[in-house]
């Protein structure tokens, strides 16, 4: 039995609120249960130096957690003077995932910076960030098309992400913190709206997992991501 009484395949209630802030070209509040992340997409003309003159754009991401997004206050990383390895890993994951769904040639020499700020954390912050950031990205691209900055839509497909794992010997989807912290296996999966895999991060935290369990976890992730994409589409429509 899961602490929330959810079934093994059941995700938490997922909400996506668009245009959550006034200034960003795309902004979304994404909620996976008690995990809440503000995702903004900022569109700027021009690209990093290594891409200049190549006729293509760039998408990158930054990630952070507010000091009291967790049960006890943590210092701001800016106050410590450096980002943690975890933060760097997560923002690279978000950037890689989003670049997979954008046609960089169609974007032209423009840059989109995604900022994912965790307001409240209860497990799955990186997967919630990717899911919300994709919707914010769509809004930023639509803004640029409306302004005539880009002519065609660079979006190739929607992407979403979910955590899956083995908890008390059972494969489950969308882990909350109490499950994540005690899971025997923890995995983050990013997929396209058609179920193609973009990234898998999987670790045996306690017991090694079998090939059969891996296939079961990926099946859970695929079904959950299909449901999450439906939430994205409903928000965009």
Swiss-Prot record:
In terms of InterPro entries, this protein maps to: ExoRNase_PH_dom1, ExoRNase_PH_dom2, ExoRNase_PH_dom2_sf, PNPase/RNase_PH_dom_sf, Ribosomal_Su5_D2-typ_SF, RNase_PH, RNase_PH_bac-type, RNase_PH_CS
Q: PANTHER family, per this entry?
A: EXOSOME COMPLEX COMPONENT, EXOSOME COMPLEX COMPONENT RRP41
Concerning Gene3D superfamilies, the annotation shows: GHMP Kinase, N-terminal domain (3.30.230.70)
* UniProt-listed Pfam families: RNase_PH, RNase_PH_C
Write down the HAMAP family for this protein, in alphabetical order. Answer: RNase_PH (MF_00564)
EC identifiers of the protein: 2.7.7.56
What keywords are assigned to this protein? Answer: Nucleotidyltransferase, RNA-binding, rRNA processing, Transferase, tRNA processing, tRNA-binding
> Where does the source fall among the domains of life?
Bacteria
Stated role = Phosphorolytic 3'-5' exoribonuclease that plays an important role in tRNA 3'-end maturation. Removes nucleotide residues following the 3'-CCA terminus of tRNAs; can also add nucleotides to the ends of RNA molecules by using nucleoside diphosphates as substrates, but this may not be physiologically important. Probably plays a role in initiation of 16S rRNA degradation (leading to ribosome degradation) during starvation.
MF term (GO), any? 3'-5'-RNA exonuclease activity
Where along the chain is phosphate bound? 86, 124-126
Presence of the UniProt keyword Nucleotidyltransferase in the record: yes
Q: Which reaction does it catalyse?
A: tRNA(n+1) + phosphate = tRNA(n) + a ribonucleoside 5'-diphosphate
* Homology family: Belongs to the RNase PH family.
Describe the subunit structure: Homohexameric ring arranged as a trimer of dimers.
NCBIfam families for this protein: RNasePH (TIGR01966)
Q: Which GO terms describe its biological process?
A: rRNA catabolic process; rRNA processing; tRNA processing
Name the UniProt record assigns to this protein: Ribonuclease PH
């Amino acid at each position: 039995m899961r602490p929330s009484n959810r079934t093994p395949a059941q995700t938490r209630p997922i909400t996506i609120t668009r245009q959550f802030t006034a200034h960003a070209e795309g902004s979304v509040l994404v909620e996976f249960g008690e995990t809440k992340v503000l995702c903004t997409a900022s569109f700027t003309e021009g690209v990093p130096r290594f891409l200049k003159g190549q006729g293509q754009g760039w998408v990158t991401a930054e990630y952070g957690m507010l000091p009291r997004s967790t049960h006890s206050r943590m210092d701001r990383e800016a106050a410590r003077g450096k980002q943690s390895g975890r933060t760097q890993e997560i923002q690279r994951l978000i950037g890689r995932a989003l670049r997979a769904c954008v046609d960089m040639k169609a974007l032209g020499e423009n840059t989109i910076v995604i900022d994912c700020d965790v307001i409240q954390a209860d497990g799955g912050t990186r997967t919630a960030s990717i899911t919300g950031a994709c919707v914010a990205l769509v809004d930023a691209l639509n803004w640029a098309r409306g302004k005539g900055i880009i002519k065609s839509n660079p979006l190739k497909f929607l992407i979403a992400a979910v955590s899956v794992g083995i908890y008390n010997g059972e494969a489950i989807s969308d882990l909350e913190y109490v499950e994540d912290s005690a899971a025997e296996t923890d995995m983050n999966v990013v997929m396209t709206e058609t179920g193609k895999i973009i990234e898998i991060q999987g670790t045996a935290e306690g017991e090694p997992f079998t090939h059969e369990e891996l296939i079961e976890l990926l099946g859970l992730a695929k079904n959950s991501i299909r449901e999450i994409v439906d939430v994205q589409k409903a928000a965009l429509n």
